[in-house]
A protein has these predicted regions:
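Substrate-binding/active-site clefts of carbohydrate-active enzymes
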Residues: 136-199, 206-376, 404, 410, ...
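Conserved, mostly hydrophobic/aromatic
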Residues: 40, 134, 193, 203, ...
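Glycan-association/targeting regions that enable binding to alpha-glucans and other polysaccharides
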Residues: 1-133
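Active-site-proximal helices and loops of the catalytic beta/alpha 8
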Residues: 273, 277-281, 290-291, 295-314, ...
Length: 597
């Protein structure tokens, strides 16, 4: 009997655990020179010894506490200037195993070790924060006097269109359609957003631009007056008949070049950010710095600025333009009106910015990064569009984002730098470039396959992945390992956004796009119960749960442009809103345990 009582339990590998949260690494985000306490968990009285192993030492850890059937071991190390990598060695009788980011393994693989990047910290407010993404033109029209009017200008093959019916489904080629959503509309709905439980508002681009998506920036220094305030207008200047010459678009030119309109729009934005901050909320802007638009004052392909006082000639217009080196031109003999510039993915409406050729451009965009996170706007961070594409080489790209981080953090140390990125982001998440990413690989994609069997654009259905827990867990673990814990806790975890089909639409397992399936197919046979299941996971998963406007109200839609339908004011699914509200208020917001393992 005494022999049986003295028997040790079977070695429990499932009880072995550690990670990079503040429960197992104190402080969780150390600086060079800090002494760090690293902890490891085992089942109580279940192992002989635990060692903390790094490049430089192998330290035997000591039991520092026992709780709920677990022993906790700890050891202290001092962090230098370089990356500190470590793993654990566990001994039980004749058994030796190892533990790192891969979990328990019988053979140590160094590439999966835990890593500490000295000085890499992400804003505490962003860890686990509930975010809400707004595509401004489709949220709420708060000021009809600033609406784009039909025929105001010509863009990609046709004239601008003012949509009169708020609930109209966007056209397949709807980039030039405008519903009138604006900053005042957001201001009018701050009570709703705060009551919902939103902590951070993320706005798709708001700077001057001819499209409704505004990823083709025309002027980085000003909010588009169509989103802001128009105090000086032109009663004439609408393009008539076959006229597609934007140098005749006097109404548009007046609205977007008159400094009174531009400054009034910036002032309104400053009021919006002040009110958001007064409520204890944050705001993030969308930064599109890889490319601009052909309407941009630096290029001026539409000759909007050519004869406007106070604006130098654009690079398209003149070889002597001060902005010539902001772009790469393939034919030096094609001026005036040189169309031979490089476009991003060969799009002539999206000129690629030539940072390597212009230090002036390089410094200008760094100043733009600083401007909007500083007074009077005090924006709380940037979401960076196609961030890995900026520049013409990998080395240059990394150097730019290092300088961008220094500039932004110098202006606002608590600003977040969050990048759009598909694929492994490890190279940018070392503490000196991006803080985190939009979490496609380690959240949106695996979750949508698991719960719906659908690809995130609704372009493919795979029954073998629907409900496949092994594939889901494997994908999540694999891709989460690419994110440093500080990045994982702030990663933007979305179910839907402006580039992918609405999650609720994916629940109908219908492969399609609006161009051939039609808009009705996006809402046929959807399953709100699966949507609620997804929201529950979203609100409890490590990271920053981010709601795409209208998802909480039951909005459907195939991939863009159908995913950019207007918010269904007066037609909301109130049960879905209430479900989101409960999840957001009682599961996600601060004081949420964002650091939970």
């Amino acid at each position: 009997m005494q022999y049986i009582l003295n028997m040790r339990p079977v070695f429990n590998k499932e009880a072995l655990f550690s990670d990079g949260t503040e429960y197992y690494r104190i402080p969780a985000e150390p600086k060079a020179g800090d002494t760090v306490t690293i902890k490891f968990r085992t089942q109580r009285n279940n192992v002989d010894s635990v060692y903390l192993v790094s490049q430089e030492q192998r330290v035997q850890m000591e039991i520092c506490g026992t709780e709920n059937g677990f022993d906790y071991y700890s050891a202290q190390v001092t962090i230098g200037e370089d990356i500190f990598r470590y793993y654990f060695e566990i001994q039980y009788g004749r058994v030796t195993c190892y533990y790192n980011n891969q979990g328990v393994c019988m053979k140590h693989e160094g590439r999966m070790d835990f890593e500490i990047y000295p000085g890499f910290d992400t804003p505490k407010w962003a860890k686990g924060a509930v975010m809400y993404q707004i595509y401004v033109d489709r949220f709420l029209n708060g000021d009809p006097t600033n609406d784009v009017v039909t025929g105001e200008y010509h863009y990609i093959g046709d004239k601008s269109v003012q949509v009169e019916q708020w609930n109209k489904i966007p056209a397949v080629m709807g980039v030039r359609e405008f519903y009138g959503g604006d900053l005042q509309g957001i201001m009018n709905k701050l009570d709703y957003l705060q009551d919902l439980g939103v902590e951070v508002i993320y706005l798709n681009p708001i700077f001057v631009s001819p499209s409704n998506h505004k990823y083709d920036c025309q002027d980085y220094d000003y909010v588009d007056p169509h989103y802001g305030r128009i105090v000086e207008d032109c009663n004439e200047g609408i393009l008539l008949g076959d006229d597609d010459d934007n140098s005749h678009a006097w109404k548009y030119i007046k609205r977007v070049t008159d400094k009174k309109n531009l400054e009034a729009s910036n002032e309104l934005f400053a009021k919006l950010t002040a009110e958001i901050h007064r409520r204890g909320m944050k705001i993030i802007l969308d930064g599109v710095f890889n490319h601009c638009g052909s309407f941009n004052k630096w290029m001026d392909r539409e000759r909007i600025y050519e004869n406007q006082e106070g604006y130098p000639k654009g690079a398209y217009v003149s070889a002597d333009s001060p902005y010539r080196n902001f772009f790469s031109f393939n034919d030096p003999n094609a001026w005036p009106y040189n169309t031979s510039y490089d476009g991003w993915w060969a799009h002539d409406t999206l000129p690629k910015l030539n940072y390597e050729g212009s230090r002036e451009l390089y410094d200008y965009i760094l100043r733009v990064g600083q401007k909007w996170v500083s007074a009077p706007y005090n924006v709380d961070g940037w979401r960076l569009d196609v961030a890995a594409d900026l520049g013409h080489s990998n080395d240059f790209n990394h150097q730019f984002w290092k300088d961008f981080r220094k500039a932004v953090k110098a202006a606002n140390p608590n600003a977040i730098i969050l990048a759009e990125h598909y694929g492994n982001p490890e190279g940018w998440l070392k503490g000196d470039e991006w803080d985190t990413v939009m979490n496609y690989d380690a959240f949106m994609e695996p979750l949508t396959w698991f719960l719906t069997g659908m690809e995130k654009h609704s372009d493919e259905y795979r029954e073998d992945l629907l409900g496949n827990s092994e594939a889901f867990i494997g994908a999540m673990k694999t891709h989460m390992r690419a994110l440093h814990m500080s990045a994982l806790q702030t990663a933007m975890n979305e179910l839907s956004n402006h580039d992918h089909s609405r999650f609720l639409t994916r629940t109908n397992h219908r492969v399609g796009r609006i161009s051939y399936a039609g808009p009705e197919a996006a809402s046929e046979g959807v399953n709100p119960a699966v949507m609620r299941e997804a929201v529950t996971i979203q609100m409890t998963w490590p990271g920053a749960p981010t709601v795409y406007y209208g998802d909480e109200a039951g909005l459907c839609g195939f991939t863009d442009p159908d995913n950019r339908r207007t918010y269904p004011w007066g037609r909301e699914d109130y049960q879905m809103i209430d479900f989101h509200r409960v999840c957001l208020l009682y599961t996600s917001p601060s004081p949420r345990d964002y650091a939970a393992s």
